[in-house]
Amino acid sequence: MAKGTPRRNWSREETILAYELYCRTSFGRIHSRNPEIIELANLIGRTSGSVALKMSNLARFDPELQKRNITAMPHGSKMDGIVFEEFSKDWQELSYQAQIIRAQLQNKEVAEIVDLADIESIPPGEYRERMMKTRVGQYFFRKSVLNSYGNRCCITGINKADLLIASHIKPWAVSDEHTERTNPSNGLCLNALHDRAFDKGLITLDGQYRIIISDRSRDVEMDKETAAWFWKYDKQCIVLPDKFLPGKSFIEYHNDVVFQR
């Protein structure tokens, strides 16, 4: 910033964009060299360093960091707290509002930014907007969950993105659309096989984040090598994310309702 140039306060819209990107970015990648941070900085006319700093400021409101005694940047604006408080209770709205703001700044439609080409054929109206919100929320959920786990399966460590799924702990169909469906704490990063097993209740987690395999899995036909590989993770702790720890209430729901005992 040139000497004598007045400091420009962050607007609500800019703060929403920074918070949405914060949610989609692992802590180790919150720095001025991150291409996505550079892209956002260019979009809003700021330096990548200032965007990275804003994201670090937002981290101080994260209750999970506070529980784990992880120190975030101690300073920030009142707007940071307002945005964090508002949208940490409505993840779907955070993801959607951020894409609306981004689209307006780029003079584009939301469908162009998040690759929603198949929705463009739906006539404008309430149904189309609801579909767009859902798809944008799914995009946000996947990015947030996978990045929180470092793009690795939390059970096996597989790190091929094409083989990874952002799995819902409490199933999407029965989750609240505002507080649960796109809440990254309702997600696990799993490979396709373990995602399916988790979805069908053949595996679950306990309160200590240990993997519990259902005895019903023994009825599944598989060769000895596959069985040994599948069962070796029983009672092992998952690799925990650097933020958005799996919510205990979501795990309890999966234990009680989904898991096959």
Positions of predicted regions on the chain:
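A detector for short metal-coordination/catalytic motifs
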Residues: 171-261
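Histidine-centered catalytic micro-motifs used for acid/base chemistry in nuclease
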Residues: 166-169
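Short Lys/Arg-enriched helix C-cap and helix-to-coil transition segments
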Residues: 63-84
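Short, Lys/Arg-enriched anionic-surface-contact patches
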Residues: 2-21, 132
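Short alpha-helical "recognition helix" segments of helix-turn-helix
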Residues: 36-41
